[in-house]
Amino acid sequence: MVDPGHNFALHTAAPAKAMLAYMNPEDQAKIIDSITYTRYNENTIITKRSFVKNLKETREKGYATDLAEEIINLHCVACPIFNHKLEPIASIWITGPSDRLQPERFDEIGEIIGESALKISRRLGYEPELNGHSAYE
């Protein structure tokens, strides 16, 4: 159970990872360098190197995940939302108990969330076709 208003750490939260993965490299590096990689449990990413690898995988998949990295038995899948400048400005996600939101379904769920994120992004002026940028392929 997550208490209302709970703030997840940047290195554990799928919505944060979804945005960070698509930030410009300079801003991304500043944020990554500022993180204290606190261990919450055995699933937590605890090194900068592992976190950077996770962000690279996020870009490759088009969605970010949280595999019970802060709260045991809680998974999350998230996709970024972009503005007209191709900047990630928000995320959309689904969170659930790990027995119901299982890794085998992450690709399917990521695709569904990605479709919604693309619709929202387009409403904000995001036009990936004009410059070859797309997180939702």
Predicted segments with their positions:
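Cysteine/selenocysteine-centered motifs that mediate thiol-based redox chemistry or coordinate metal-sulfur cofactors
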Residues: 30-31, 35-36, 117-137
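Generic secondary-structure transition motif, activating predominantly at the C-termini of alpha-helices
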Residues: 23, 35-36, 55, 59
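Intrinsically disordered, low-complexity segments enriched in polar/charged residues with Gly/Pro
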Residues: 6-7, 37, 65-68
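Intrinsically disordered, low-complexity polar/acidic regions
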Residues: 40-41
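Amphipathic alpha-helical effector-binding/dimerization core
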Residues: 1-34
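Generic alpha-helical structural context detector
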Residues: 17-21, 56, 118, 122
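Extended hydrophobic
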Residues: 44-117, 135-137
